[in-house]
Amino acid sequence: GWLKSGGYQAPDQSVLDEFLRQLRASTGDARPQLNSGSYRLQRYKEAIYLLPEDPGPVDQELAIAPGGVIEIPGVGRISLRRTESEGIWLAADESLSLQWRDGGERCRLAGHKRSKSLKKVLQEAGIPPWWRQRVPLLYLEEELLSLGSVGPCQSSRWGVSGQDAEAPWELVWEPTIASGYD
């Protein structure tokens, strides 16, 4: 039922039985998976994820402006929208860029005392390994402002009202993922 509700064809019973056997037999960090060609079932921590076919790497830098929405195959829907709570102060005409992990980036999440590597921040946020290269990073020139929907980084724009800024903004990432099942 779970696969069909997502519009996917169930695998042969023998393939599904083998996947279930691997799930029961695996321990710790093992991540059994079932590849069907059009989707993949994979365990991460205590959940089974139904993932669309891997669309390949994401590496192009994209421009986004406050109020903008971008749909990226294999990544999802990314928007920069106003928030009523604390956020990133931007002028409506500022041009920002969405980039992807390259390695070595650091962020001090807003409200935290220390900066950490993005790898560590994403692990602590529970982002599955296969999604970590797809988390959109919001930059203003060379300054990292936010990590997908993980949260904003402490920056020159966090919580500081600029004279051209009308309201705070937040980066919202809705990943392309069929679902996770506990």
Show which residues each predicted segment covers.
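AMP-forming adenylation/ATP pyrophosphatase catalytic core
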Residues: 1-182
